[in-house]
Amino acid sequence: QAEDETSVPMAVEELLSMPTLEIQPIIFEQRYIPTEMCMRVARSSLRTPPPLPCSPKLYHGVHLFIFVHGFQGQSCDLRLFKNCISLLYPDTCCHLSEANERNTEGDIKDMGRRLADEVRAKVDEWCATEASLARISFVVHSLGGLITRAALPLLADFSSKFHSFISLSSPHLGYMHNANKIVEAGLWVLKKWKKSLSLQQLTMSDTKDPRDSCLYELSGNDSLRNFNHICLVSSFQDHYAPFESARVEVSEDTHADSKFGEVYSEMASRIFKSVDIAAVVRLDVIFKIAEKNLDSLIGRAAHIQFLECIPLMRMFVHTYTTFFR
């Protein structure tokens, strides 16, 4: 007698949480460990440093996450990342920044002021007293990373609450060394045609002397030192945010640049001058981008993947738990 098909249990699989190799990004991690730990690692003959701690420090109160979009972006751009955090850490409060939705072509410092005002408004709205605010973390994409850094000095009274600064392909050192000529041409057109001040600032063409530029001034802001965790995420495939700029690193090509190399190196040093380097994690992401089109050619496809690649986001919130709780 044939077996009744209705009685056969059906396998239930959640394929999204375990993506296939065709869509799973490849991620390389770089971080620093204290000298004394290096000595212990050397003595124990371990070839890799110990993993990041999984047990977070206990805290009481609200952990507020602020998500900041990039150039010509919208508040909903980072909604998928927000959803991943909210599902795994339901006690967190998440806000998608709206302060600069229609103003990303203006002055980065003005955008920072608007963001700071918005953060204060959310603290007042969600935290009845200052004591109920335990932590503030930022998840930023593209230009949003520089906008956030411009806002941090204006939030100095909350600096003891700063917890995680997660930067997704943000050009912290600008666009001085962009290898993609098509992107460079596009930037030139936007600067000339739309008179975009923020793009002038990103290319350090807003002043004659680069040391008077907005980006150089911003590099002297030491507010990042107040964060317990700083994560700089980058991709070689993304030409909208140059690789070294997103990682705040100085390459050999930069040292060889007689025009901007010295200024570029100074900016990188100034950003990390007061930062505990053990708090910094750099992630290099390689996306599976199958389709060959203009977006993949100019690097826009990878830039957008930071907003759309759910496997990357899920890996992030499950692996780096101390960033989120």
Question: Where are these predicted regions, by residue range?
Answer:
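Lipid deacylating catalytic domains
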Residues: 1-17, 21-139, 143-325
